[in-house]
Amino acid sequence: MSSDELTQPAGEHVDPLTILQRGTIEIVGRMPWSSNATFLVSVVDGDDTARAIYKPARGERPLWDFPSGLFKREVGAYVLSAVTGLNVIPPTVLRSEGPLGEGSLQWFVEADFAQHYFTLYEQREDLHDQMRAMAVFDIVANNTDRKSGHCLVGPDGRLWGIDNGLCFAAESKLRTVIWEFGGEPIADELLNAVRPLRDDLPVTLAALLDADEIDALQERVDDLVTQGTFPIDATGRRYPWPLV
């Protein structure tokens, strides 16, 4: 796959959710370095064209600590990001009729892939608040795999988190590279964004999770709101591998 294929922009005025939900999907190529089958695709809806990332269910490798259906967790991550207003996950939808069957379809983030969380944290202080928002998301979602390379800056200057399939486990599994804010008070804006989840989960998210995962998510929100600070990794072991 050429670099040109990775960077072709979407057409002007394309609504991401609309084209992802109803566009025709055509595989462009397989994404390198992915543990599961992950494809760059072209999505066409009338005169509109966009790039997206397609993760079919049939391309998932079995995991001992997660059930099958990681593509649904990719969708759930976007739903959580959207309903809370944290807006750290690119638009992602469930498609039942992709080229390789059912799977998730996520808006492709055009980015400088040489830049990732570690470099961005050092060079882009203006992104630190967005990193805090992503940290809150990862805590609530119980993200087990927030690698540095999963943090990308799009053309709009927004920080996006990709590869969110390993989220929402009932057992505490948080592994992330975002620990620099440990011990800091969490801004009221961020706490207020997730606080409503303590009492009620939107149907669009609850439908993607098991009952014990819903209970655990609400407990994480309650703990976070009660403590009001970013957690500290006292062990130094709660990092994903590889780091990038």
Language-model features: where?
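Phosphate/dinucleotide-binding and metal-coordinating scaffold of catalytic cores
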Residues: 1-244
